[in-house]
Amino acid sequence: NPKLRLKRGDEVIVPAVSWSTTYYPLYQYGLKIKFVDIDIETLNYDLAQLESAITNKTRVVLAVNLLGNPNDFDCINNIIRDKDIILLEDNCESMGATFNNKKTGTFGVMGTFSSFYSHHISTMEGGIIVTDDEELNQILTSLRSHGWTRDLPVKNLICDDKSEDLLEESFRFVLPGYNVRPLELEGALGVEQVKKLPMIISERRKNAKLFVETLSNHSDLLIQKEVGMSSWFGFS
């Protein structure tokens, strides 16, 4: 899909508050990062400033759902509608959150999730990427394993048809990949914890409700305004 192909120097809009992993991959790929300030109430994009920041050079808006709190995706989609702009999601802190009954991480072309040990579920290290774009799916599958073709279908969207020679395809590399495959133990931990995710999020929401009820009238505190249904990665 030519519309999803970026080149060095393309402009990506990001929120001014996030974890470093939101920014550094963009920098490493030579993309131009433009910071937009956050809304002090939601801690996500200040939507008026986001709209003002978009120019004809903008190719991507990267939405970060901070501390479990969804962005207002109705507003973001209205801002980028009819523009050649890709929406991506950093959903590493918001697994299980919803906006208009839709899971965060599924509004953009791709959504990333973290399973670091301090997150909603843990495989100690690791994460998940979701996409409904088959070409991106195949690219990601190859990138996670050195850029090889072993895990691609015979007819694929990255290279020519794979050979029936298993030896050849075992040592054929077509992308500048990484080695980020999970260990079986990590995968097993993740599979079991996903089963518990509804309970985990339910308990976080109960705890957050208690904090809100206890602290909402404190004159020195401003509590993060919930958009949609937060999964409460943290309380701020």
Question: Which residues make up each language-model segment?
Answer:
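Short beta-strand-to-turn element immediately C-terminal to the catalytic PLP-Schiff-base lysine
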Residues: 113-114, 127-133
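Structured loop/turn residues at beta-strand edges in well-structured enzyme cores
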Residues: 7, 56, 105-106, 122, ...
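Conserved active-site segment immediately N-terminal to the catalytic lysine
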Residues: 89-123, 138, 169-172
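PLP-dependent aminotransferase class I/II
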Residues: 48, 52, 60-64, 69, ...
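Adenylate-forming
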Residues: 123-127, 190
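Structural signal for conserved beta-strand scaffold positions within catalytic alpha/beta enzyme cores
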Residues: 35-37, 113-114, 223-225
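Short amphipathic alpha-helical segments
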Residues: 111, 125-126, 231-235
